């Protein structure tokens, strides 16, 4: 648009004044992260350059930078809670370590998704 890609500071001020006269205003935002959620994927921009332009009450956002794309199916897998099946061996170990009944040990293991150490700590308190 301009020779050498640079603009005279005086021209820049004139251009900004003209934009304001036409009801246009622009501002650079200090964004750290921008996330755009689409139907099939999520786009994440780290350290983007974000500019907002207000034209007669309508705001337009311009985002530039590199994005990382993540599919939504991967996100759904992470959100799904996995139920761990507690073995009889684990129940006996926790019951013996904490000197509690097998029923108490089984309940504690189910509460912490089969984590032996966490179940022992839970019953120890």
From Swiss-Prot:
Gene Ontology molecular-function annotations: RNA binding
Highest taxon listed in the record's lineage: Archaea
Domain named NAC-A/B: residues: 9-76
Keyword Transport: yes
GO biological process, one term: protein transport
Keyword check for Transport: yes
CDD domains recorded: UBA_AeNAC
Cross-referenced SUPFAM superfamilies: UBA-like
Short name of any one Pfam family annotated for the protein: UBA_HYPK
InterPro entries: NAC-like_UBA, NAC_A/B_dom_sf, NAC_arc, Nas_poly-pep-assoc_cplx_dom, UBA-like_sf
Keyword terms of this UniProt record: Protein transport, RNA-binding, Transport
PROSITE patterns recorded: NAC_AB
Quaternary structure and partners: Homodimer. Interacts with the ribosome. Binds ribosomal RNA.
Function: Contacts the emerging nascent chain on the ribosome.
Stored HAMAP family: NAC_arch (MF_00814)
Family, per entry: Belongs to the NAC-alpha family.
Protein name: Nascent polypeptide-associated complex protein
Gene for this chain: nac
